[in-house]
């Protein structure tokens, strides 16, 4: 068994700055997150947690923001590629727990589809995926509505033992 932790944060752009994508879901909101890729903090944190658990570095090492190939990249594709490397190393997902930290917009209506997307991308059952959201009670940059943060914890199991 191996445990990994991931964290990501992106700040909001101006009104009309693009789509807000979290957990692979387009969420109606007046602002998008600024990023080299699509800015999906949930998938970035999950990808970092997976890579960390397998000692494969981090999302910035695998998909550097200095590489134009990843400009505007779909984070679901990045997650799938990272997971392909996890499988090649002899591990599979045990479970994934994600916490989205945002004052707005409300995430609860979108969490079921986020779980579906993650289970599909990680080739697992939805019972292996948990996504929850919280606020910081209007404290800090997320509380002021300046951006969104996300943490993820993952358990990998050896394919031969799992």
From Swiss-Prot:
Binding site for a divalent metal cation: 8, 10, 44
GO molecular function term, any single one: 2-C-methyl-D-erythritol 2,4-cyclodiphosphate synthase activity
CDD domains: MECDP_synthase
Metabolic or biological pathway: Isoprenoid biosynthesis; isopentenyl diphosphate biosynthesis via DXP pathway; isopentenyl diphosphate from 1-deoxy-D-xylulose 5-phosphate: step 4/6
Pfam families according to UniProt: YgbB
PROSITE patterns named in the record: ISPF
Known cofactor(s): a divalent metal cation
Enzyme superclass (EC): lyase
Cofactor binding note of this UniProt entry: Binds 1 divalent metal cation per subunit.
EC id: 4.6.1.12
Catalytic activity field: 4-CDP-2-C-methyl-D-erythritol 2-phosphate = 2-C-methyl-D-erythritol 2,4-cyclic diphosphate + CMP
Keywords: Isoprene biosynthesis, Lyase, Metal-binding
Keyword Metal-binding recorded: yes
Subunit structure: Homotrimer.
Family to which the UniProt record says this protein belongs: Belongs to the IspF family.
Protein role: Involved in the biosynthesis of isopentenyl diphosphate (IPP) and dimethylallyl diphosphate (DMAPP), two major building blocks of isoprenoid compounds. Catalyzes the conversion of 4-diphosphocytidyl-2-C-methyl-D-erythritol 2-phosphate (CDP-ME2P) to 2-C-methyl-D-erythritol 2,4-cyclodiphosphate (ME-CPP) with a corresponding release of cytidine 5-monophosphate (CMP).
HAMAP family cross-referenced by the UniProt entry: IspF
Name assigned to this protein: 2-C-methyl-D-erythritol 2,4-cyclodiphosphate synthase
